[in-house]
């Protein structure tokens, strides 16, 4: 049985105009092979397998952009003309979203290498800082202060990242951070396959992150849930932080309401509909 890379097959069979576009569709979870979702572009599949592309065409280079887009809409964040950073940039979904919302410059920071989409690598507004650990970045590294930062990191807790980001922000700077329960809860609270399903653990994690944010001088200004789950099916949350202004009262009842709504909407499927 002859096999071929899935991204190559998508191009050969006319589902995508280029391998770059094919990769985006695959990483967005929009490609089914014999009705099974495949999200790795390099996966080899039988050439006679039935391919199907589902869902609307993504407006960003990866589905990550949908997460930030929801946060910006819910929180009313404005990026026009601002200098920003995408911390944990990966393919650059957040970076793309920022640019489409008028950001003047985006520092795409990631410890990985070769992940940033070519469209963004070749955009003069993007500073590609791959192979860079955010904890090693200083205002001197950038040569300027940030008006805005997004945080979407894996295998590290936000309590290690938020203090660093606070030092990089200009007066009045803002942050939208993705809270991932699987990387905030202790190992004993993470379930099979790295998924945290217990809403009570989600609430605890959010409260922990809020406490860290406040300790660093941030004013919590908004909280919502991500419209799409993480790769393994984890429900994630978006936290809006400001360095100035009045804080929103995020008591236990408020957090409980957000978590309950997230599970009601997202449990059993990967995205809002």
Question: Would you name each region that the model predicts?
Answer:
Residues 92-93, 114:
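Glycine-rich SAM-binding Motif I of class I
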Residues 107-160:
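S-adenosyl-L-methionine
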Residues 1-47, 83-84:
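A basic, amphipathic helix-loop patch mediating RNA/tRNA/ribosome contacts
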């Amino acid at each position: 049985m002859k096999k071929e890379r899935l991204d190559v097959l998508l191009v050969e069979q006319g589902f995508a105009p280029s391998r770059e576009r094919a990769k985006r569709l695959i990483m967005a979870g929009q490609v089914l092979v014999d009705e099974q979702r495949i999200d790795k572009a390099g996966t080899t599949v039988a050439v006679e397998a039935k391919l199907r592309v589902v869902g609307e065409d993504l407006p960003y280079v990866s589905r990550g952009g949908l997460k930030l887009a929801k946060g910006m809409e819910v929180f009313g964040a404005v990026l026009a003309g601002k200098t920003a950073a995408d911390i944990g940039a990966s393919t650059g979904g957040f970076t793309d979203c920022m640019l489409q919302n008028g950001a003047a410059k985006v520092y795409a920071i990631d410890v990985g290498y070769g992940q940033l989409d070519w469209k963004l690598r070749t955009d003069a507004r993007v500073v590609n800082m791959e192979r860079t650990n955010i904890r090693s970045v200083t205002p001197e590294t950038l040569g300027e202060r940030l008006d805005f930062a997004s945080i979407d990191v894996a295998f590290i807790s936000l309590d290690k990242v938020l203090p660093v980001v606070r030092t990089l922000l200009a007066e009045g700077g803002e942050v939208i951070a993705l809270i991932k329960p699987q990387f905030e809860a202790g190992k004993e609270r993470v379930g099979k396959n790295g998924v945290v399903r217990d809403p009570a653990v989600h609430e605890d994690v959010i409260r922990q992150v809020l406490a860290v944010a406040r300790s660093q001088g941030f004013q919590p200004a908004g909280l919502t849930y991500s419209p799409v789950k993480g790769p393994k099916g984890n429900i994630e949350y978006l936290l809006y932080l400001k360095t100035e202004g009045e804080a929103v009262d995020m008591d236990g009842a408020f957090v409980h309401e957000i978590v309950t709504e997230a599970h009601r909407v997202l449990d059993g499927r990967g995205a809002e509909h």
